[in-house]
Design a protein with these regions (language model features):
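Bacterial N-terminal signal peptides that target proteins for export
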Residues: 1-10
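C-terminal motif of bacterial Sec signal peptides marking the signal peptidase cleavage site
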Residues: 19-22
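Conserved functional acidic sites
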Residues: 24-183
Length: 183
């Protein structure tokens, strides 16, 4: 009788351990490697030239049910820019703003190919840009922006590039991506 009780107790203990270990939620999910993204997004990422010129991801927030990252930039020591960005399920870089949650601006399409075109807002007004993918390699993507609906800016395109695993190109004195200091 003692043997049966001991075996039953041991079996119950093993089953309880299996259940508790099997139902454990992963509290540290694996983050995508920085090298997998043309714009790695994690709070604390830093692109730094000096104390008057840098961009840092300061926070994350939800806009219209979607997670965005708050990019804070100081330019020339006195100009400030704040952008709220996310990469959607189709690989598009989307900008929005908590003050204007219905605003969605497509800034890049990382799944596109050279020659593909898209519009930033699709509204066909003077703030809408036609974007053309001009370069795509294993390490870099470039996008040409042309304000084709603006009477004075049409035909004066500018290019924005992204480096895989780094995000913004540049000769950074400090570069921190996904918790790893690269420079």
């Amino acid at each position: 009788m003692k043997d049966i009780a001991l075996k039953t107790c041991t079996l119950m203990l093993i089953v309880a351990m299996m259940i508790s270990l099997g139902c454990k939620k992963d509290r540290n999910p694996v983050q995508p490697s920085a090298s997998d993204s043309f714009l790695p997004m994690q709070v604390g990422n830093l692109w730094y030239t000096n104390n008057q010129n840098y961009t840092e991801i300061k926070d994350s927030l939800v806009i219209s049910g979607k997670l965005y990252y708050k990019f804070y930039s100081l330019i020339g020591g006195d100009a400030v820019s704040t952008s709220y960005l996310r990469i959607d399920e189709q690989g598009k870089l989307i900008a929005s703003d908590p003050k204007y949650p219905d605003l969605k601006v497509v800034r890049a399409d990382f799944n596109g190919k050279v020659g593909d075109k898209f519009f930033t807002t699709g509204q066909g007004n003077d703030t809408d840009n036609e974007v053309t993918i001009t370069e795509k390699t294993n390490t870099q993507m470039s996008f040409s922006f042309d304000a084709i609906y603006h009477p004075n800016l049409k035909g004066h395109a500018y290019v924005v590039s992204y480096v895989k695993g780094q995000g913004f190109p540049g000769n950074w004195t400090k570069l921190k991506i996904n918790g790893v200091t690269l420079k």
